[in-house]
Structure formats: C-alpha cells, structure tokens
Amino acid sequence: MQAEICKTDIPHMLEISDVVHEGKSQKSFFFNHPMECKPGQFVMVWLPDIDEKPMAVAYHSKKEFAFTSQSIGVFTNALDKLKKGNKLGIRGPYGNSFSTKANACVVAGGVGLSSVSTLIDALKNPSVIYGA
C-alpha cells in the first residue's frame, strides 16, 4: 500500500473508516491508508457530482490519516452527510512544508487548529495560542 496516494488527475477512491464529531458542525474523517506528509501539506478531496476541495491533513501515521471539515457550504454540507463506509476521492499530499527546527508560536482559531495540528506535532517545543 503506497503512502503517497495519488498525485495525478485521477483521485483514489478511499473508504471512510471512522467519522469523529469534533463540535457542532465539525467532523474528522479517518481513512485506513498510510499517509506520509509534512506539516502544512493538504489533500484534494473529491465528492463525485459535487466538487473537489483542498483539505489540510489533520492527522497521519503509518496506518491512517484524517482531515477535519466544518459545514459551511455546498461541498462541506455534502461531506458532513457522509458516514463510515462511504467512499470519496483523495489526491495528494500536496503543498509546501514548514521548517520545524526552530521554536515557534502557532496561532489558530476554531476548526483552523486542525490545519496546523501536524505542524504542532512536529515542533519540539511549540507555544500554541488557540481561540474559538
């Protein structure tokens, strides 16, 4: 099983292994598929007949990965209706990373914290300022 899913124009259809409710309108979608990515990278998420959008990788390991979404529009409302066992298309990871060698202060708010969670995990001594 390759860790780099697909960097072509064709999304790889993956089954949702778990859905975690993170708040009133936020959910994390987990996939039993390895993901090698660096802090700040994202995947393209494709919902057939709806659209394709970039989503930051919120969690990754040698066995699984996840992204977190907040329902605020047509695409994310459709995503919110998906359940464990449903499939969607994934391409990536894409994007540039950040240096994790120096100390850093990470500032995030609301669901935006999920987009920097891999950076926080990679930093040796992070200071995190979080607001709702």
Task: Label each residue range with its predicted role.
Residues V74-A132:
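FNR/FR-type flavoprotein reductase catalytic core
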Residues Q2-K84:
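Ferredoxin-reductase
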